[in-house]
Regions:
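Basic phosphate/pyrophosphate-binding loop/patch that engages nucleotide-derived ligands
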Residues: 9, 23-37, 137-138
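Rossmann-like dinucleotide-binding domain that binds NAD(P)(H)
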Residues: 49-117, 121-128, 201
Length: 227
């Protein structure tokens, strides 16, 4: 098969699935460590907004930023697809987003066919670094994939206690290991006849969820996700 027909060219777009912390959540979920999945909470905040020129062509926060979280949420939900979504956005600190008809802050609530809830929180800016966290809550427990810090040192002094280093400030640094795992997986796929775990259809579905989020933003109510 060709690279295109096997969907190998589309693998790189879902690097978050390859993040050691995020993928470990999936492994523990499959092993039944937290029982039945009930709720997914994803926090994704960038250190700073991209350039105005980039924002103008980005398609908006739901198609440019939250779309990655939609894919990650589906990764955890598995075959239990999301069927409805409520989305909202606002601008508080950076009013220039109003002129772009975009948002610096966005939140979405999704629900699967079987009732699993998902809350996604996005921000175009975050003073303490690249904030990337995932929480899976189940009938028997909870597992969390936390932020990656510059180091694991904690400082205690007469001025502060448990002062920690800052989080990563660039997505390539934050997902450095994820990109490496992705390349390793891609190399294995090239040497075999196997197909990737995710492909074009996953990207298409994420776009469909993003479009439904925009519909909800306008209607100010839950919308059925149109696949």
């Amino acid at each position: 098969d060709s690279v295109a027909s096997r969907g190998l060219g589309d693998v790189y777009k879902r690097q978050r699935r390859y993040d050691p912390g995020h993928s470990s959540l999936k492994s523990n979920l499959i092993k039944g460590k937290i029982g039945k999945l009930e709720k997914i909470i994803i926090t994704s905040r960038d250190p700073a907004a991209p350039s105005i020129n980039y924002l103008k062509a980005s398609g908006g926060i739901f198609k440019d930023m939250m779309i990655h979280d939609f894919d990650l949420a589906r990764y955890y939900a598995g075959k239990d697809e999301f069927v409805s979504i409520f989305a909202t956005g606002s601008n508080i600190s950076n009013k220039y987003f109003n002129k772009l008809k975009d948002f610096e802050l966005a939140t979405a609530i999704l629900k699967t066919k079987n009732g699993v809830q998902c809350i996604i929180s996005n921000s175009r800016h975050c003073s303490f670094g690249y904030d990337q966290r995932v929480e899976l809550f189940g009938s028997k427990g909870m597992i969390i994939s936390d932020n990656i810090k510059e180091n694991e040192i904690s400082l205690y002094s007469n001025k502060s206690t448990n002062a920690r280093s800052s989080f990563k400030h660039f997505f390539i640094e934050r997902y450095d290991q994820a990109y490496k795992e992705q390349l390793n997986d891609l190399a294995k796929l090239f040497r075999s006849n196997l197909r990737p775990k995710s492909g074009f259809i996953d990207g298409k579905i994420s776009i469909q969820i993003a479009e439904s989020a925009i519909l909800s933003l306008k209607s100010k109510k839950f919308e059925k996700i149109k696949y």
